[in-house]
From Swiss-Prot:
This is Osteocalcin. The gene is bglap. Disulfide bonds join C19-C25. SUPFAM superfamilies: GLA-domain. InterPro entries: GLA-like_dom_SF, GLA_domain, Osteocalcin, Osteocalcin/MGP.
């Protein structure tokens, strides 16, 4: 599984930019973290 520590700051920012367009994903990111939220809404991270 991908963890935040496995990604560069630029990759994390890319995930945030996608996730913040979806209110539900953005809210989940605030509580569960950006990686968990992105995977829940968009599937595996493709970097």
């Amino acid at each position: 599984a991908t963890r935040a520590g496995d990604l560069t700051p630029l990759q994390l920012e890319s995930l945030r930019e996608v996730c913040e367009l979806n209110v539900s994903c953005d809210e989940m990111a605030d509580t569960a973290g950006i990686v968990a939220a992105y995977i829940a809404y968009y599937g595996p991270i493709q970097f």
